[in-house]
């Protein structure tokens, strides 16, 4: 994979790995297409369709035991909108008030962007216009949170090559956590004991192999 920084990667292989490691505000039901609670246990939408209030799951934790908070999402969204990071998907958040202006340098004040932590577990999002598909967009990895202290311990907010994504450094909030990464060989993820829905995670480990040949891939399942 290119990497496992959800604000940097762009490929399908990376997505397959990241959905095991990270979790956004919502998660998709692949059978029905319904948007299910993820890091947010519930949400409300204003009558004009422009304000969203997310109540975060108070049992949601990072793999190191830290609680997943509204401020984590505010900082993470500021990160993807930081132009010097060079994310390929900042426009995923352009539906927010002031987001495009912040990303393009019209304003340097992130307080003007429509995302606020009302309290520890309440996130308010203000959109420029009603966007019925906004909730569905939140299942895209570019909107997922990253662990601020881990990122900054190993680099700056806009560091594309920070060591925070390496085994032993990577702190995530999904059902699995990073166990090992053998370059050009395999990535192993293991069940995250701090995941809020831990008991429903039926696998103890998953192994991801880089396979570019369809025939090779087919033989691996025989």
What is the meaning of each model-derived region?
Residues 7-16, 71, 137-143:
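Short Gly/aromatic-enriched secondary-structure transition segments
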Residues 46-47, 117-119, 183:
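Residue-level recognition of beta-strand termini and adjacent short loop/turns
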Residues 1-47, 171-172:
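N-terminal lobe/hinge region of extracytoplasmic solute-binding protein
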Residues 26, 30, 61, 78-86, ...:
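Sec-exported extracytoplasmic/periplasmic mature domains
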Residues 29-30, 110, 126-207, 213-215:
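Gly/Pro-rich hinge or "lid" segments in bacterial periplasmic/extracellular proteins
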Residues 1-2, 41, 51-54, 73-76, ...:
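Short, well-ordered beta-strand elements
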Residues 55, 74, 81, 85-153:
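Surface-exposed binding/hinge segments that line
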Residues 41-91, 124, 217-222:
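Aromatic- and charge-enriched surface segment that lines or borders ligand/interaction sites
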């Amino acid at each position: 994979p290119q990497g496992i920084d959800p604000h940097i990667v762009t490929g399908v292989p990376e997505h397959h790995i990241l959905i095991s490691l990270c979790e956004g505000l919502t998660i998709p039901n692949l059978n029905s297409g319904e948007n299910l609670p993820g890091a947010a246990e519930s949400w409300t939408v204003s009558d004009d369709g422009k304000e969203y209030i997310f109540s975060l799951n108070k049992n949601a934790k990072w793999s190191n035991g830290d609680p997943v908070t509204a401020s984590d999402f505010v900082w993470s969204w500021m990160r993807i909108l930081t132009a010097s990071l060079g994310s390929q998907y900042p426009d995923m958040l352009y539906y927010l008030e002031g987001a495009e202006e912040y990303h393009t340098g019209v304003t340097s004040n992130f307080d003007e962007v429509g995302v606020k932590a009302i309290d520890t577990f309440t996130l308010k999002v203000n959109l420029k216009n009603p966007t019925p598909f906004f909730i569905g967009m939140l299942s895209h990895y570019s909107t997922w949170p990253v662990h601020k202290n881990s990122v900054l311990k190993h680099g700056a907010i806009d560091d594309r090559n920070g060591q925070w994504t390496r085994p032993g450094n990577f702190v995530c909030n999904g059902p699995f956590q990073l166990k090992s990464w053998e370059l050009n060989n395999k990535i192993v993820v293991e069940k995250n004991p701090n995941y809020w829905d831990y008991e429903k995670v039926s696998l103890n480990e998953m192994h991801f192999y880089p396979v570019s040949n369809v025939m090779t891939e087919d033989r691996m399942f025989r």
